[in-house]
């Protein structure tokens, strides 16, 4: 990339900083949840809404981000994304109640939803095609470093300053990024088709209401009548979208996608699989601090092996899938992740703390193999005219399923805890034991979906698809 103009290299740095801010925020909050609960006077069982509000907002807003960038311009939207994310961070740091913090996280999520996809679009527009892969590798590297630094940095800030600083550190970076975006980034626009606003609103309503209904009485304290109303609104919104999209060439997501069996299996497996995977990054630091008495910094350090395992596995996952095929890899990794989550729990309760980093490293490896395999399985057989729509739908489903996973994890803690988390250690351990047993069952269930992947889904299509997309 050294032969690129200096202005383009600066633009790539701006995108890279955006990726770093967004990825750091996905992991830095988890370690701070128990401290936030104590500061805000809330039960730790209710703090999952801080994560759910952000991830669910990202899922809802993702379908609109690419269209907005093409219509309004990548510079304008990227600048807006950074400003919203930074303002949301400031409001998070100033929040004095859980409700205020959740609302600030929603604002942060709107910015985060636009930052990464618009950043990818920017790279596509400013870099020659033959250097696109090298440029994307450069800008996504900080996005891989963010999850690695997040847990430990969050633990340090909570232990030696306060939880407010996990949000305040975004502000100087955001200000510099916003100014640099205005000064250095070109405002590319494209001719766009009409945005499917009706479909977008129906899907957004369906996702938001059903996820909130899942939290229900335990987390939100709503009455059974309101709960039934949320479920009814959510189901009606999704059914109306199906009716709206049927035969509609301008639908947000074409129903023709689901005529492809591989896509349907991959998307269903990705949705179910990421529900289970989404529970673990939330539950692990909470269990380490509340269940085992780890400090926030120590709990954050324990999360690093999981990220390292994930990064290491990404280097060999293509060879593994090519050797064993999608079905074997996905079924084995799904059941393996359930087993490893139980191994982590029993090792921790037995006091074998020296084993935990190795178990978390293995968990990260298995998770990475699942994610990469699920992504390629879902998209690899789509025709070119549906590839973009399928990729957008997969991105939305990934975020939605993660928010549902965190919601279910919080629901399980509340169900087994019954507000008794402050009792003796044996009772607390029992609460987490039952929660992890339930989580392991949920994690294992997608193996039933992946077992239906046919044998003729050839392993060599992974590399063939990669070469085709990179040519």
Swiss-Prot record:
Cellular localization per UniProt: Cell inner membrane
InterPro entries, per database record = MFS, MFS_dom, MFS_trans_sf, Multi-R_MdtD
| Transmembrane feature ranges | 12-32, 49-69, 77-97, 102-124, 138-158, 165-185, 195-215, 220-240, 263-283, 286-306, 329-351, 393-413, 431-451
The organism's superkingdom is given as Bacteria
Q: Which PROSITE patterns match?
A: MFS
A GO MF label: transmembrane transporter activity
Q: Which Cys residues form disulphide pairs?
A: none
Any GO CC annotation of this UniProt entry: plasma membrane
Pfam families xref list: MFS_1
Where would you say this protein principally sits, based on its record? Answer: membrane
Q: How does it sit in the membrane?
A: Multi-pass membrane protein
This protein's UniProt keywords? Cell inner membrane, Cell membrane, Membrane, Transmembrane, Transmembrane helix, Transport
Entry similarity comment: Belongs to the major facilitator superfamily. TCR/Tet family.
Question: What is the official name of this protein in its record?
Answer: Putative multidrug resistance protein MdtD
């Amino acid at each position: 990339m050294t032969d690129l103009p200096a202005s383009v290299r600066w633009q790539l740095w701006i995108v890279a900083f955006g990726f770093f801010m967004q990825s750091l925020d996905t992991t830095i909050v988890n370690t701070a949840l128990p401290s936030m609960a104590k500061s805000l006077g809330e039960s730790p069982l209710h703090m999952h809404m801080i994560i759910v509000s952000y991830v669910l907002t990202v899922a809802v807003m993702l379908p609109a981000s690419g269209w907005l960038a093409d219509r309004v311009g990548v510079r304008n939207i990227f600048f807006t994304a950074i400003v919203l994310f930074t303002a949301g961070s400031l409001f998070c740091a100033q929040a004095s109640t859980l409700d205020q913090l959740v609302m600030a996280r929603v604002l942060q999520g709107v910015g985060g939803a636009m930052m990464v996809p618009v950043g990818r679009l920017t790279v596509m527009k400013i870099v020659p095609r033959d250097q696109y892969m090298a440029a994307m590798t450069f800008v996504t590297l900080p996005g891989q470093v963010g999850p690695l630094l997040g847990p430990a940095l969050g633990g340090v800030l909570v232990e030696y300053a306060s939880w407010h600083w996990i949000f305040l550190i975004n502000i100087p970076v955001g200000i510099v990024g916003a100014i640099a975006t205005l000064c250095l980034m070109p405002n590319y626009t494209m001719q766009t088709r009409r945005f499917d606003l009706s479909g977008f609103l129906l899907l957004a309503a369906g996702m938001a209401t059903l996820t909130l209904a899942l939290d229900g009485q335990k987390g939100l304290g709503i009455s059974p009548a309101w709960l039934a109303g949320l479920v009814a609104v959510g189901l009606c919104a999704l059914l109306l979208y199906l009716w709206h999209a049927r035969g509609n060439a301008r639908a947000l997501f074409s129903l023709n996608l689901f005529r492809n069996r591989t896509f349907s299996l991959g998307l269903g497996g990705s949705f179910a699989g990421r529900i289970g995977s989404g529970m673990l990054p939330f539950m692990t630091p909470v269990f380490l601090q509340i269940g085992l008495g780890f400090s926030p910094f120590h709990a954050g350090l324990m999360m690093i092996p999981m990220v390292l395992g994930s990064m290491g596995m990404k280097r060999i996952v293509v060879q593994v899938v090519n050797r064993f095929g999608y079905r074997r890899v996905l079924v084995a990794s799904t059941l393996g992740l359930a087993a490893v989550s139980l191994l982590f729990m029993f090792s921790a309760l037995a006091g074998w703390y020296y084993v935990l980093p190795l178990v978390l490293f293995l968990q990260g490896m298995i998770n990475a193999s699942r994610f990469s395999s699920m992504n390629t399985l879902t998209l690899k057989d789509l025709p070119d005219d549906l590839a973009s729509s399928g990729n957008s739908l997969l991105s939305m489903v990934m975020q939605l399923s993660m928010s549902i996973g965190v919601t279910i994890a919080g629901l399980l803690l509340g169900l087994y805890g019954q507000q008794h988390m402050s009792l003796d250690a044996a009772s607390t351990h029992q609460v987490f034991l039952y929660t992890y047993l339930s989580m392991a069952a949920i994690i294992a269930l997608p193996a039933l979906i992946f077992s239906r992947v046919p044998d003729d889904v050839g392993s060599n299509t992974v590399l063939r698809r990669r070469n085709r997309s990179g040519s």
